[in-house]
Amino acid sequence: MVVTRSARPQARNEATSVESLRQKNSAVTRLHVHPKGRKGSSPDNPNTTESQTTPERSPAPKTRKSGTTGSLPEMNKPATDGEISEAESDCSSVPEVQDPVFRVTRRRQILVAGTPVSSVRKRLKITRVSESHTEEVVSEADSHVSGISRIMPPTEITTRRSKAKSQREPKQESHVEVISDAESSCSDISFSGIATRRTTRSMQRKLQAQTEENNTKIVLENEKEIIHTPVNLEDSVNRRTSRLLARSLSQINKPNFSNNEIYNDPDDSFFGISGKKLAVKKTRNFTIREEKQDSISPLKEITKQNCKSLDEEAKKIIDGGKEGNEKNSQLNLSEFQDTGLQQLVSQRHSTPESDKTTSESSTLNHEAVMKSLAQTFAVVEMDRWNEERKNAIKTSDCSEPGDGSYSDSDEECTVIGVSEDMSKEKEVDSESDTKPSNLEFNTTQDKDDSVLLVLSSDESQQSEHSENEEDTVCFVENNGNKESLNGDSENLSHDNALFVIDTTPGLSADKNFYLDEEDKAGEVATEEEEEEEEEESEEELSDHDRNKDNEFSDEDNLLSNTKSKLLKLMSSSIDTGLNIKELGGLYINFNADKVQLNKRTLTQMKEKRKDELLQKTVITPEFEKNYCVPPYSESKYKLQKKRRQERQKTAGDGWFGMKAPELTDELKNDLKALKMRASMDPKRFYKKNDRDGFPKYFQIGTIVDNPADFYHSRVPKKQRKRTIVEELLADSEFRRYNRRKYSEIMAEKAANAAGKKFRKKKKFRN
């Protein structure tokens, strides 16, 4: 049930009816009967014990002024739907109710519950989402049952930090009531019944200044009521001693809040039978051991002094608590509904007295812890990483023999707390109560060196310490991975470069690429030896180091391996058929001092440069034979003459620059045969050649066989000759025709000669 602000004026008006109803109830007698009836049960199920101790550990929910006074008359009203819905919720969550008590001051009336061992938490009434506004008005006993019973919704989880924030001193509880109802009610339904609160540094300073005054006022105002109120002595003594232990533990455990968590199995919480003995013992052992492990170096001196006294007090209190816890389990829901109001009143009177007894010891412990932390934090910050592993083994021996049976559950609890804190780190980061509490959180999570969390804070000094701490964390982590990184340094040296000129493709810059067979065999052997050394070094690493390497260097190894493989596959190691040694080696050289150019290439380049220079010089190789030194510049006339001679060498652009060949005897005979072509081949007609001499520009070409021509109609390649005259002489038809013509010509000449002779004779005769 939630009391809103609008219901508070109505609560003030109905305050008188509360007093009348309180007098009419016969709960005073039941107040004495109730603790006795509780003593008859036996601690059978450890899960119910955990659930019953949870209300004791959490101090009472406190609302703003008269926030509960309005809820008292409403709880006394008869309810129909509200009781049924609360009964259903109680049946589903197995409510386990502790002795509730009202603490009455001048202005407000507060619901309080005892805290034997564990963390302190503010609890408000539970809001049912499915219920309507009219169902919120339920009876007083139902509200106590629903407010104190541990309800575990599966969706909400309270982190270790939120639990640690609620581990406040009882003297601070009265001033934390200023927190709004909505904020506290939203955080009411939680895993272990602990509500998170957010306090600033100014709020803490005000609280520390005001708590001492208010505690004395509360005690002075309520001394008379405490004297006249009937209180069960055994119950009050147990409550005081349990609170004394809880506060002394919470003062030391306050900086080390990350592991102060009691794991409650949800399955066991639903089917729990009462068993407080197991839970109290487990809680004590767990908190003592965890505070020893967590405050290793900063709280080393304090814990040595306080752990012994805490162990003695815990044994005494638990021995006395066992007797009371065995008798406190069997109660019906109806008895709680009848006796709830008076029990709240009795607890309310007992709490100021317990506050008075424990205020001095808690303040002394708190001041001692804060002073020692302020003095030793700067000195011990660098040393606590080295001392952490050594002390973790020693502190495990400090726990009692009863820890052995619950070691598995404690380890499970630690794992769950770490995972929850990692997920909720950013949300509850601003809720830190003290500076050492955030800084010690790193030591508890960094035991295994697998999860490294450096918390940030709003305080400037704490941020500086956290930066230093982050450096130390990285230093420790690098020491762990030093061996694995040394093995991969050779591969990563050339893979990390963005732009690499591939001097020796596919390999590192130190290795040779073009190797002989012997060199290759030697290099393969060296690579195998290096791989074996790396494997041996990896085998020497422990399982813990391998886990760290897998977490931090799997991706780097993947990238480096793929890069090296791609380089080997895509490198220019293909045989190109060129001998680079003969060509003078690679054309890119990184070492400028070791440049060795080939001598042949140098001489060739020098000769070319000399020829180019000598062409323009006057001094030529035959300079000695000249009679005079040639002029450096020629006249225009001589230049024109040279150009004319150059032009005469070719037939011009019209003949495509045909050059004039040199006339030889063979060329002259060919030209004569071409002139006589008409007489040599009478069957064809040739144009008459009027030229007397030989042509200046001509070319003699070759006949290209036409594939369309008949084979015998063309001259085969074997029968072809070098000149035209030789081909004519080799032709039989030409020769036969040439003989016949030759004889005819010779006969004519002879006839002509005889006729002239005959004519001459005749001439003389006449």
Swiss-Prot record:
The modification Phosphothreonine is found at T127, T229, T620. GO terms for biological process: ribosomal small subunit biogenesis; RNA processing. Residues 13-28, 42-56, 435-444 have a biased composition (Polar residues). Residues 166-175, 421-434 have a biased composition (Basic and acidic residues). GO terms for cellular component: chromosome; nucleolus; nucleoplasm; small-subunit processome. Its main location: nucleus. Residues 558-615 are annotated as: TdBR region. It is found in: Nucleus; Nucleus, Nucleolus. InterPro entries: Fcf2/DNTTIP2, Fcf2_C. The keyword Transcription applies. Forms a ternary complex with DNTT and core histone; interaction with PCNA releases DNTT and H2A/H2B histones from this ternary complex. Interacts with ESR1, ESR2, PPARG and RXRA. Part of the small subunit (SSU) processome, composed of more than 70 proteins and the RNA chaperone small nucleolar RNA (snoRNA) U3. This is Deoxynucleotidyltransferase terminal-interacting protein 2.
